[in-house]
């Protein structure tokens, strides 16, 4: 997927993301799972309901 920025809890700021993938939680909510470009921690960005 394309590169985007999202909030990193460890860095405490918006950081670029890499290795992003769309996932669906058990409650049918969709999110983008990615990693922080600086500290490599896993982070999620909620993108809405799955239907």
From Swiss-Prot:
Transmembrane segments: none
Zinc-finger ranges (unnamed): 8-39
Subcellular location: Nucleus
Domain of life: Eukaryota
Expressing tissues: Sperm.
Any one GO cellular component localisation term in the record: nucleus
Keyword field: DNA-binding, Metal-binding, Nucleus, Zinc, Zinc-finger
Official protein name in the record: Epididymal sperm protein E
UniProt organism field: Sepia officinalis
């Amino acid at each position: 997927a394309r590169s985007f920025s999202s909030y990193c809890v460890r860095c405490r700021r918006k950081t670029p993301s890499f290795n992003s993938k769309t996932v669906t939680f058990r409650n049918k909510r969709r999110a983008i799972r990615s990693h922080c470009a600086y500290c490599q921690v896993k982070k999620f960005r909620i993108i809405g309901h799955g239907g």
